[in-house]
Amino acid sequence: MSQSNRVRDEVTLPLLQKTSHLKNHSSVLSVFLNEAISICKISYPLVLTGLFLYVRSFVSLSFLGGLGDATLAGGSLAAAFANITGYSLFSGLTMGVESICSQAFGARRYNYVCASVKRGIILLLVTSLPVTLLWMNMEKILLILKQDKKLASEAHIFLLYSVPDLVAQSFLHPLRVYLRTQSKTLPLSICTVIASFLHLPITFFLVSYLGLGIKGIALSGVVSNFNLVAFLFLYICFFEDKLSVNEDEKITEETCEDSVREWKKLLCLAIPSCISVCLEWWCYEIMILLCGFLLDPKASVASMGILIQITSLVYIFPHSLSLGVSTRVGNELGSNQPKRARRAAIVGLGLSIALGFTAFAFTVSVRNTWAMFFTDDKEIMKLTAMALPIVGLCELGNCPQTTGCGVLRGSARPKIGANINGVAFYAVGIPVGAVLAFWFGFGFKGLWLGMLAAQITCVIGMMAATCRTDWELEAERAKVLTTAVDCGSSDDDAKEDMEAGMVDK
């Protein structure tokens, strides 16, 4: 009998322990799976949004091509300068608004979310004034840069008729942030789909029926964006569930807001975010300029344009994931849940690695066919096929790097991202690419190897910043960030510590 008990103890207890371990592993897996589902629920409608906007740009490009080579070249030149001088600024500045709104929503400070969105709209409207002046004088600037007169004239017309779009974008970016930080991305996606479907008939009416040419293409983009703004306003005003605001927040907002300090808080996040975005966007434009100095500049520039089309398509996916991770991290830090914020960051980075391998496989698989969608020139097709595997390796690093940016944005540390991008793209990427292309004779391939070096540097920096994050400290900073400043408040030192910590971490 004693032997039977001993056998039973020796056998049964380990089985119970194994069962307990399995339950624990199952519980951990379930928690991480639920987090992945939460991130994907935010991100997948954003993927749909991005794809429809991508198709919309193709529609405009097709109409430009139908107007002749000079109009196509002029419109493409205008789009490049619009990205460099306008849209990159708007996108970057909005990231600062997103950092505040995501944490404020997590802290249930809904009035503060609305106030931050309003400040974001004002900031972008003010920014649009110097951009407008720049666009109105773009023909002179292009001629100074030794561009062809005809191309400069076409680009100037396109930009001149695109000026109202700056107003639309000033409302559109903050409204997207407002919905995204509440995880309401499906309504945003539906509104974008409707506006995108209307874009084709609007463009046809303005270009083909009214015969406005390049003016009509520019105006169709303006009308489509104003339609999207109108749809978002209609949803927010009539269909959105109204956010309940607690009384303590009402009193604080009504009696003690220090607008100067709040603007300083916003600008401390918006300006570094803007620098970070612009550094990355501008790097690709510099690569196009460098292509003009290669042995076959025409084929190199054309191939670079085709490759940027595929990187833009692939970028929709990590960018959408990044926005989802940013929202989850910001919401959890705002609600004082540092462990959950850390979990969201880990799960997001895990998803981004899987996405990176998918992007790599896609770019390699289409290396011999992608250029056929744009040209039948053998030399351009050869250059594109040669570079696409390197582009795939770039995307392998770009996916976790972009998601890392989302983690930094959700934890309101944009200065770290700006520093990493500055070093990666301008101290590593462009110099390495230029040396390989011109000094060692790698040519077009060398430029993309430089971009690969930049992405490797970037992903190492982002991973290091994420791994070194003190999540408890970030939760404390979130409390400071999402608290409206009292008139005569005594916690100025805490705010200064928070701002300094955005760089020191």
Swiss-Prot record:
TM ranges: 46-66, 78-98, 121-141, 155-175, 194-214, 219-239, 275-295, 305-325, 344-364, 380-400, 424-444, 446-466
Up-regulation conditions: By abscisic acid.
Gene disruption phenotype: Smaller and yellowish rosette leaves. Enhanced sensitivity to abscisic acid (ABA) in growth inhibition and seed germination. Accumulation of ABA in leaves. Enhanced tolerance to drought with lower stomatal conductance.
Summary of the tissues where the protein is detected: Preferentially expressed in rosette leaves. Detected mainly in the vascular tissues and guard cells. Mostly detected at reproductive stages in young anthers, in mature pollens and during pollen germination on the pistil. Also expressed in developing seeds.
Keywords: Cell membrane, Endosome, Membrane, Transmembrane, Transmembrane helix, Transport
Pfam family, one: MatE
BP GO terms, sorted: abscisic acid transport; regulation of response to water deprivation; response to abscisic acid; root morphogenesis; xenobiotic detoxification by transmembrane export across the plasma membrane
Main location: membrane
Location in the cell: Cell membrane; Late endosome membrane
Membrane topology: Multi-pass membrane protein
GO CC entries: late endosome; late endosome membrane; plasma membrane
Molecular function via GO: abscisic acid transmembrane transporter activity; antiporter activity; xenobiotic transmembrane transporter activity
Keyword Repressor among record annotations: no
Family classification: Belongs to the multi antimicrobial extrusion (MATE) (TC 2.A.66.1) family.
Function recorded in the entry: Functions as a multidrug and toxin extrusion transporter in the export of abscisic acid (ABA) in guard cells. Plays a role in ABA-mediated growth inhibition and responses to drought conditions. May act as a negative regulator of hypocotyl cell elongation in the light.
Anything else known: Overexpression of DTX50 alters shoot developmental programs leading to a loss of apical dominance phenotype.
Protein name per its UniProtKB record: Protein DETOXIFICATION 50
Native species: Arabidopsis thaliana
